[in-house]
Design a protein with these regions (language model features):
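Membrane-embedded alpha-helical bundles of multi-pass transporters/translocases
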Residues: 1-302
Length: 302
């Protein structure tokens, strides 16, 4: 472990745990959306339907960004309870060590997820050169940031610096790869809608995260837990309760602000969810009606 303090400083194990938690929303949301849209986008490009491919990419980027800002807000608002809930074997001190690099990684969750879609768009054009150039530039920036931070930061922050340098490198270099992709799509990539949606989601996510961070210590004390490196204590059930309460708060604030700012993607999501609920309700009603009729007929015969 960095700094020679095996138990007081976050090291490789803390980073690996943090990365495992960080990658969960990326794997579930970003990878799923990319897997679904890539064949459709590739087919559209091969058939020279660039407008359809552009629409698919824009919609996917906006949907992914909307989800990733939410997960970023939720996870940053309650890192210690979240770590304790997902890794029950760790104590509060260990959860605090994991929380540092976890927050550092979460800073770059949105651009990291967006790059997966951008990368597949290049692959749809059978272009492997542009993603390679981006990866080279991203790694160079990450290395520069990391070496600079290690030069000035004390050892106990080195693991956090590794995570932050990864996130900041994506944030710094992503506009360039987005510009390269824009050229691929003939100079138009629906950039205005994508940027506006991300700005609104950033505002909503920041406000929701701030509310969660404010309530976190209050809820922690309410359930009888304590977050401290020295004498902290938190059971698994307490962490679950804290996560549940804060998730409800962050979700309510995030959804409310998206609704107030009239984010199109959020409105479409609500409409889709309502339609599915109505469809399930009507299906359940149609299934129960014949059964009720048979029961009434049997009672009449008796």
């Amino acid at each position: 472990t960095a700094g020679g303090d095996l138990y007081g400083i976050a090291g490789n194990a803390s980073y690996q745990y943090a990365y495992t938690i960080y990658v969960l929303p990326y794997s579930i949301i970003a990878v799923s959306i990319t897997t679904a849209v890539f064949p459709r986008m590739s087919r559209a490009i091969s058939e020279h339907r660039i407008g359809d491919a552009r629409a698919d990419l824009s919609s996917s980027l906006r949907s992914t960004g909307l989800a990733m800002f939410f997960f970023t807000a939720v996870m940053i608002a309650m890192p210690v309870p979240l770590v304790k809930a997902l890794i029950p074997s760790t104590n509060v001190h260990g959860a605090i060590l994991i929380s540092g690099p976890l927050i550092g990684l979460l800073v770059g969750l949105v651009p990291t997820s967006a790059f997966l879609l951008v990368q597949r768009a290049f692959y749809a054009y059978e272009d492997g050169r542009s993603p390679f150039l981006f990866a080279a530039a991203d790694n160079a920036v990450q290395l520069l940031l990391l070496l600079t931070s290690l030069r000035f930061a004390p050892p106990k922050y080195w693991t956090l610096m590794v995570a932050l340098s990864l996130s900041l490198s994506y944030i710094i270099t992503f506009p360039w790869v987005f510009w390269l992709l824009r050229r691929r799509f003939g100079g138009r990539i629906d950039g205005k809608r994508i940027i506006i949606m991300h700005v609104k989601a950033l505002i909503a996510g920041a406000a929701a995260c701030a509310c969660g961070l404010f309530l976190n210590p209050l809820v922690t004390r309410l359930v009888g837990a304590k977050v401290s490196s020295v004498n902290g204590h938190m059971s698994w059930w307490q962490s679950i309760v804290i996560c549940a309460i804060l998730t409800i708060v962050v979700t309510a604030v995030y959804a409310g602000l998206l609704w107030l700012m009239r984010v199109e993607e959020f409105s479409s999501l609500i409409v889709t969810m309502k339609a599915r609920l109505l469809r399930r309700t009507s299906t359940a009603t149609s299934v129960s009606t014949p059964a009720e009729s048979e029961t009434e007929e049997a009672q009449a015969q008796n």
